[in-house]
Each structure stands twice: as C-alpha cells, then as structure tokens.
Amino acid sequence: MIAARLNMRFPSERVKAVTLSYDDQSEQDITLIDILNKNGMKATFNISTGLYSYEGKQFKEGAVCRRVTRKRAIELYKDSGHEVAVHGFSHPYLTQMPSSSVAREVFADRLNLEADFETDVRGMAYPFGDYSYSEEVANALRATGIVYSRMTSATRKFRLPSDWLKWNPTCKHTDEKLMELAEKFVADATNKEPMLFYLWGHSFEFEADDNWEVIEKFCEYMGNREDIWYATNIEIYDYVQAYQRLIWTADMKRVYNPSAIPVSFQYHTIEDSGEIKQTYTVCSGETLVLTQRLNT
C-alpha cells in the first residue's frame, strides 16, 4: 500500500492567501478601499447598522470616527468586491447580555445588511473584540447563522483557525512587527501547509495617527502578487469548507468534489523511491482519479 497525505492549496494551486478586516463603517473606509483596489486586495467590512450616521449630521471638530450614513454605506460597499459582515446592531459588549439579546443584536444586524446589500451575510467581527467572546455568545451566533467571527488577539502566525468562531488575526496594522511579518510571509518558500496573513484594524486610526503610509506600504508590498490569493473572510471560510467536503475513496486514489467551487490540493505519496508530490484541482461536481505513480 502507498502511504498518502494531503495539503490544501488555495485557488489556482496557491499556498498563500491574504485577507483584511476593518470595523465600524467610518468615512476613512473610502480611502482604504481605494488603496486595496489599487493593489488587488480584498477586505471584509464589519458594520453596526444601528450606528449609521443620519443624513446631514455635523461631526464635532476633531472627531475621527465619522460613521457613514446608510445611503453612503450602500454606495461604498455594495458590489465593491469586498464583503460586509455583522458587528452587532448597536456594537454592544455581547458578554454583558443574555443569550436572547445577543441573538437579537446579531440577527437584526444581519437582516439589515442582507436587505441593503442584497447578499447573504454569514460573517462577523466581535464588537470590542475578545471582550465579547464566550461559549454562550458563540452558541447564540451559531443559532443566528453566523459561521465565523473575528477576535482581536494577534497570533503573529499564518495559520487557518481551528475554531471559526474564535478566528484570531495575524496582527493589527498598529503592530510594530507588521512589515517584518509581511516580509517573512512573502519570503517563506516551504510550500507545505497553507498560509494565511490576516490583518485587521479601524480605518479611522490612520487619520487619528496620521499614518496612512502604514497601510499604503503594506498593500504595495503585499499586493498584486501572482502567488497570493486575495480573498474576503467569507471566501476563505467557504473555500476551506469546500476542501473539507471532498469525498475520498478508502485508497485515496479517487476524489469527488460535491461543492460549487473548484478545490486544489497537494497530494503526497511515500514510495520506495522516496516522497512524490503532485498538485491537483478537482472541479465542481467532478470525480478525479489520481494516478498511482505521480510525476515530480
């Protein structure tokens, strides 16, 4: 018997992916989206629909967290190629509420987003980050159809989450090691496990700290690379789920893809002559028969 093992590959057989997540629907998202689009990158924008600004609102002098109106949000995010996700209708501390109220906060936000942006919304970022997480909160999210939710503790790693409702990012854009981590990510050539760089923050912080060059430098360095898949949070989630739904025969020589998207993987075999690797893509609805002896 030939021993075999698998490593997931992102679309177009890539090893690496990058995703971003920004909260609170502030006016500065307009500039951020321009920077992302210029560099071929994608982000998820986490919105509290109960906190839209009203039309004609005059902000106090010096205010930096200037939330957009509902109308402007639709103009900005709808059909932009970026994702909108839940952030709690009123941005509360979810751990300070009963489960029924957590569900109401999340479900109301989800309903509003789906109505305004005419898309399914299944993702979220915890308002106030880790302070809003508990097992009880996570159970309430599951009941409302949320499949992933981002936390705020930096891992400084490039791993996929083991628990999608406790999805911690690589780092925030304020991390002093941001570019060091970016360079490490780009330079890594091990080509083993899939690698994900996950950046998060609030775009109004760039104005508050007068440092738009931080995200510009990051995106210019990390963006527009052929070997990186740029995806929203939900695209990352959906792709991993599709990979995990692949159906294999017992001898691992035949695989069926029941999902709606193509899935890539690296197939390793250990034979007398040594380890042999081949990368495959199995299309939606396709059954792929793998050759017994693979080309290197």
What are these regions (language model features)?
Residues 26, 172-189:
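A Trp-anchored, charged/polar loop motif used as the substrate-binding/catalytic surface
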Residues 7, 31-35, 136-140, 214-218:
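A short acidic, amphipathic alpha-helical/loop segment
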Residues 37-137, 143-147, 152-171, 195-203:
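Metal-dependent polysaccharide deacetylase catalytic core of the NodB/CE4 family, i.e.
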